[in-house]
């Protein structure tokens, strides 16, 4: 009987653990890419040259104006030299270059960079103000000094609650966006 109780408890914990799911997401160029996620979080992408450490949105407020920008961090493998790092948003019909670093610097074994600031308004960043869940997909490409290129795709997902938290961080005027 005692073993049966422990088995039930153990199965309860296993049943509560988020399962890994593979999800196909369409990207620019009429293609789709498979992503692994656990719960609502996508697994960080990696290949034999580098691994994604961070891909996410940050907020910035100055002089009463609200901004957002993307922040990316990768960790190159020990034998990988960086000559150029490019990050493209491939969520839409065409890729959009958001970062091109022609002189990447490694600090504490990582490369990190932020995109330019974008005004956080419903007209300029409409997905942030939509109540629907949003998935953004980025292609991160590393070019090495010998011209060798390698790329990974990284997805990020924002549900309605996460978007609301971003708007709260930015300021009271963005907490209740206008109805579309």
Annotate each predicted stretch with a short phrase.
Residues 1-18:
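Sec-dependent bacterial lipoprotein signal peptides
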Residues 15-32:
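Bacterial Sec signal peptide processing site at the extreme N-terminus
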Residues 27, 42-47:
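Proline/serine/threonine-rich low-complexity linkers at boundaries of modular beta-sandwich domains
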Residues 50-78:
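Contiguous beta-strand segments within globular domains
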Residues 68-72, 83-85, 136-140, 154:
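Hydrophobic residues positioned within well-ordered beta-strands of beta-sheet architectures
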Residues 77-103, 140-142:
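Extended low-complexity, serine/threonine- and proline-enriched intrinsically disordered segments
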Residues 102-147:
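Short, solvent-exposed, Trp/other aromatic-anchored flexible loops in extracytoplasmic proteins
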Residues 148-180:
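Short beta-strand elements
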